[in-house]
């Protein structure tokens, strides 16, 4: 005869759920996206309008008129006493001093965050000058600090290009990882667009790149990427590039997606064999298999440094039909390789 188990005290499901909700909330990764200057604020606006979830969005600028046009959870007019809300005059040193004047306001939005994305267009005054200040504050607060920046179109002039390279060199010293997108390389994807439309494409790619990383952490998937996974490749990850790919060729989607991503103009002329880490994020419709996603990660591992750390995840999106999409973030890329690729464009 089996001994009857002692009856357990009854606990209502609602009480259990409340406790679980409290635990889940305490474990929730806190993420902030801070847009610096006009370009960074535009990216924040696009993310806000797209309804990106689980992210605090903050826009910072020295131009009051532009800041008024931005949708965000929070806004900071930097350097009030210095610029009077009239902008930085395209001078990075003014952008830097404005951010330093507003450090107390900026601190409120980096303190307590697990991850801070510092977003800016390099080459102008406010973004170039303030982004390193924001990144330094985020690092001081203990956050994983990821810079996401663009390098200017050549049509924007030699001075802006020179400022961009100097600003990028300064920023990379303050961030754990700095992801770089070259506007002229992005233009190769849509070569016939007028300049204003090309800037919108840049905003969209920036937004999708950040969203790809945040979704991987905050939304459940077939294979999840957790915060510690991200720390593995992005804490002290150095310079990074992003490639995006997609394919609807069933049976070859993984191969074609990765080829698309790793041969993307977004990577420029950089030798990806030097990459020391990679994050591979795969999404698809209900026909997506874990085997396909694993294949994508394997293909990336074959193209980068054999000692590189690879993390990958995959998720099903109900609005995707017969298609597979991939985002590859390559970390540990040499700074000079990116600068040379930019100068040689």
Please give the residue ranges for each predicted region:
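Tubulin/FtsZ superfamily GTPase core signature
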Residues: 1-345
